[in-house]
Amino acid sequence: MFFGIPGIILVALIYVLPARADIYMFIDTNGVIHFTNVPTNAETDYRIFIKEKRRKSLGADSEKRYDHDYDHYIAEASERHGVSFPLVKAIIKAESDFNPRAISKKGALGLMQIMPENLQILQIQDPFDPWENIMGGTRYFRMMLDRFKGKLPLSLAAYNAGPTTVDRYKSIPPFKETEDYIEKVMMYYYSYKY
């Protein structure tokens, strides 16, 4: 045998040990807050924002995110803000695929991908806390529905591209990302609804 018993144990451990994902933050000279799971610049003053706890693992399947894990939070947010349960769930699926630690290239955070500049107005202290993120994200989407008079495609476009962008175009902005986003959310919405 080429690897022997130690090699087999090492390969087995690679598949069994859970991944770790500490979240770091820093504030730049303009006051912009940045989050990352990989601090890349040694000169930047990164601080640990969230220390990921090591979890027991039963193998690769135990690390999967299941789309029903946050249903109780979604139900509470849906009722509180008057947004349908399947729609909130569809937005979460499209935004983060139910990853509470998701960080987009543009800096959006958590399950509903809240932009850092919206955290204060949405009363979110910890954007990686599933309950806070879902409550704040649903509240923000309710604000978009109200602003765009309940028109779902415009509200989804505003959630994705920003309300001022939708105002500027007076319709869905002609961005492939936004058009694809609306289509994806609607597909998930109908799959959760029926």
PLM regions with names:
Residues 39, 44-194:
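Catalytic glycan-binding domains that act on GlcNAc-containing polysaccharides
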